[in-house]
């Protein structure tokens, strides 16, 4: 749209100027990270508490209701929102974590109900495969996003550390297939730490989304 300047130009004709664009509202606007981060925090807290012993040891399905219905679903919907508003990096991060949480739920349910016809003796190797695959993916994500503020890098690095500890726990299984409880608990505490960093990121996004000033997120490690 254009508006007509009240003053005339050198030719004596009105001068057309660009009017400021109207703010975009509706589903094609906003910050999807507010919802995405809240979803991420919910699943992280549930998994971390389960790993440190809030529920009986070995009850892997305890956090699944939150992980599947809140975290995985929330992150995947946030991915669509981010892609719709052109935030490709945010969409990639939420998409990666959304599919991670979804695949965790499928893994636990699949092993418990024998969906994939995996022999009992191969169940431990299947869990190791899952953890190693996602460790590689999250390490790659960490390295590929070093231009993001360092608070995001800290989350990705802590997720990688948690996956490494859980992988080591399953590498040290007993003859009965029981993983190392101490390493599982260590991994659980790391999960709670990256959930806490996620809370900080959520507050930053919420502050900005409600008209305030975003919290400092630290300098990027790569310019």
Task: Give the predicted meaning of each segment.
Residues 1-82, 88:
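N-terminal topogenic module of multi-pass integral membrane proteins
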């Amino acid at each position: 749209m254009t508006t007509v300047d009240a003053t005339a130009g050198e030719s004596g004709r009105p001068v057309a100027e660009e009017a400021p664009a109207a703010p975009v509202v509706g589903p094609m606007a906003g910050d999807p990270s507010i919802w995405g981060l809240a979803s991420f925090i919910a699943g992280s807290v549930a998994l971390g508490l389960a790993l440190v012993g809030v529920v009986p040891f070995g009850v892997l399905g305890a956090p699944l209701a939150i992980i599947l219905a809140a975290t995985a679903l929330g992150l995947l919907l946030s991915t669509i929102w981010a892609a719709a508003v052109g935030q490709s990096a945010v969409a990639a991060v939420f998409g990666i974590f959304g599919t991670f949480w979804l695949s965790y739920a499928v893994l636990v349910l699949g092993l418990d109900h024998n969906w994939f016809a995996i022999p009992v003796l191969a169940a431990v190797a299947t869990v190791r495969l899952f953890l190693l695959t996602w460790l590689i993916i999250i390490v790659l994500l960490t390295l590929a996003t070093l231009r993001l503020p360092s608070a995001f890098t800290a989350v990705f690095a802590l997720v990688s550390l948690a996956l490494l500890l859980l992988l080591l726990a399953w590498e040290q299984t007993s003859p009965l297939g029981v993983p190392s409880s101490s390493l599982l608990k260590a991994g659980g505490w790391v999960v709670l730490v990256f959930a806490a960093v996620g809370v900080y990121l959520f507050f930053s996004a919420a502050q900005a989304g409600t008209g305030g000033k975003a919290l400092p997120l630290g300098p990027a490690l790569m310019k």
